[in-house]
């Protein structure tokens, strides 16, 4: 996990040049500090990935391949994690059937999902419950929408990584975090700047 910060003139996006500069610099640092071959790179984008950012990512990867820092067959995977999805979905666990048309009360038979529950929409989209009934919060769990537009990893591995990173709730270790550490730490940093 590598999180670095850089100010941008544009509020919600980085320039192509910024992306190239940061990725080349910090992937080189990662390579210099490991004996392992860097075979998979996963980039988490808070919100929508802009075309200039995508271009910067692939230009940086190409430069790193040309320098011999990355192998030619490196897998580049990009995940978009919007704060708000246009698709609204709630997951529940129903312990016992009851007549929902006539009974307004569920008598405790409808619970928030277990943390880590997920549903795959297709090979490029899924919802993941990074919060759940194990942590007492008011309301229903709001699953995180995962969009995986670029890459060749199985979406199940992408979901698993995001779940594990969401368990790193360093600001409150006895609680859960809706967002993975890769997004949460950046949000906290931006709020300080």
Model-predicted regions and their roles:
Residues 1-193:
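Long, contiguous domain-sized segments
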């Amino acid at each position: 996990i590598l999180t670095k910060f850089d100010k941008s003139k544009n509020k919600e996006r980085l320039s192509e040049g910024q992306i190239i500069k940061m990725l080349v610099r910090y992937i080189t640092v990662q390579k210099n500090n490991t004996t392992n071959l860097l075979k998979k790179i996963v980039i988490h984008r808070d919100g929508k990935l802009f075309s200039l950012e995508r271009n910067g990512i692939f230009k940086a990867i190409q430069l790193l391949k040309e320098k011999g820092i990355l192998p030619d067959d490196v897998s580049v995977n990009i995940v978009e994690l919007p704060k708000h999805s246009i698709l609204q979905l709630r997951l529940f666990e129903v312990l016992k059937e009851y007549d929902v048309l006539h009974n307004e009360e569920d008598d405790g038979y409808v619970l928030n999902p277990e943390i880590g529950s997920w549903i795959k929409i297709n090979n490029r989209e899924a919802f993941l419950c990074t919060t759940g009934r194990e942590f007492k919060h008011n309301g229903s769990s709001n699953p995180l929408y995962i969009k995986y537009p670029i890459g060749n990893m199985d979406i199940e591995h992408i979901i698993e990584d995001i779940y594990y990173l969401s368990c790193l709730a360093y600001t409150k270790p006895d609680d859960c975090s809706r967002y993975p550490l890769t997004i949460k730490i950046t949000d906290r940093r931006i709020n300080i700047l």
